[in-house]
A protein has these predicted regions:
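Double-stranded DNA-binding cores of transcription factors and transposases
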Residues: 1-14
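Basic, flexible linker segments flanking DNA-binding modules
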Residues: 11-114, 119-120, 268-273
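Mobile-element integrase/transposase regions
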Residues: 71, 80-135, 139-142, 153-162, ...
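Short, solvent-exposed loop/turn segments at secondary-structure boundaries
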Residues: 125, 146-147, 182-187
Length: 356
């Protein structure tokens, strides 16, 4: 019995006592369960998600019912159904969270928290894959999440180029002291830092993992949400896992209420735009774009006028012993440029070796 129903009966009983009808008072009937039975399609999906190893959480099941079947319910209803059908997962006790005030940016695009998390994401695979994840600090809009075989420079280039082309460029990224981002020489950039600097994106460094707690909690969200879904759907390859991520990401932004904001990240994003609290910059067309987001190395042209390409040597339109820039793209394409990226000049491609 719900608490509201209890107080309704209690008030009715006190009124009967005041009217001298306490001996004949009876609580009456509630009218029974007014909720319709769930369809076989709904119960089949719940059973599939709760029976997977590891099982999905109740909130994840409710979210998947909405995303896949357009059936709206809450986690409490899923929990009651799971207990009644002996499908409730054995989860550890969680203490009540204490309210904490957290600093956050005012404007959308002022600061994006960015991090990587290695984990055994694919079911039945002992090797760990890496999830690159990025989150707007002001609105909690999860602007990107993608799985890669390992955390490499090319993985970072591929991910950030995708996100910036879709959502625009922020003013700064909040990162850790990983060697991809940080160099001990304050006047020098890493290759990734140089690419971000080329497009006016600053790097701010978190002193501890707790300092970038928003993105760390998002990692925990994906580990609890994505791993059970991949196991339930028997997705064992990165291509299928990223296709599922591409569906889960907008659904979570648009339909799942953030506990700290009291609204969905999409609603917070739209509110920031309406209040003109956005400093995001669109990714303007730039001839240097494919070369900036590539792994660059300096190569000297041989006396024979050739440069190494794999186990072969190719002629190049540059004088012998000249230094050229070798650009390896995330998709495997290889370019040789006469000069390093310079916003005041245009790229001069000397050789292009496409991936086969």
């Amino acid at each position: 019995m719900a608490r509201a129903r209890f107080y309704e009966l209690y008030s009715d009983y006190l009124l009967a006592c005041a009217q001298g009808r306490s001996e004949t008072w009876s609580p009456g009937r509630s009218g029974g369960d007014h909720h319709p039975d769930w369809s076989a399609e709904v119960t089949a999906l719940i059973t599939k998600l709760l029976a997977s190893k590891p099982p999905s959480s109740y909130s994840a099941v409710a979210s998947e019912l909405h995303r896949r079947l357009h059936f709206k319910t809450d986690r409490a209803s899923v929990r009651r159904w799971a207990i009644a059908h002996q499908l409730n997962p054995d989860t550890r006790y969680k203490p009540v969270r204490k309210p904490v005030k957290r600093w956050q940016a005012r404007d959308y695009g002022a600061l994006w928290q960015y991090d990587a998390t290695p984990h055994a994401w694919l079911p039945g695979c002992s090797d760990k894959q890496v999830l690159l994840d990025i989150l707007d600090d002001a609105t909690r809009l999860n602007t990107g999440a993608r799985l890669y075989p390992a955390e490499t420079l090319l993985a970072h280039f591929d991910f950030l180029a995708r996100v910036f082309q879709t959502h625009g460029q922020p003013l700064a990224l909040y990162v850790d002291y990983h060697s991809f981002f940080y160099t001990h020489n304050p006047d020098a950039f890493t290759q990734l830092g140089a690419a971000l600097h080329f497009y006016g994106v600053k790097l701010l460094y978190a002193p501890t993992p707790q300092a970038k707690g928003k993105i760390e909690r998002r990692h925990d969200y994906w580990q609890k949400r994505l791993v059970p879904l991949l196991a339930a759907d028997h997705i064992i390859e990165l291509v299928g896992a990223n296709q599922l991520l591409d569906q889960l990401l907008p659904h979570g932004n648009q339909h799942e209420i953030h506990r700290e904001l009291g609204q969905t990240p999409h609603a917070a994003h739209q509110q920031a735009l309406a209040e003109k609290r956005s400093v995001i910059r669109p990714a303007a067309p730039c001839p240097w774009w494919p070369y900036v987001w590539s792994q660059q190395t300096r190569v000297r042209v041989g006396d024979d006028g050739k440069v190494p390409v794999g186990d072969q040597r190719h002629f190049i339109a540059a004088p012998p012993r000249a230094t050229v820039i070798r650009c390896l793209r995330p998709d495997g394409d290889l370019y040789y440029l006469r000069h390093a990226p310079d916003p005041k000049a245009k790229p001069l491609v000397l050789l292009h070796v496409p991936v086969f």
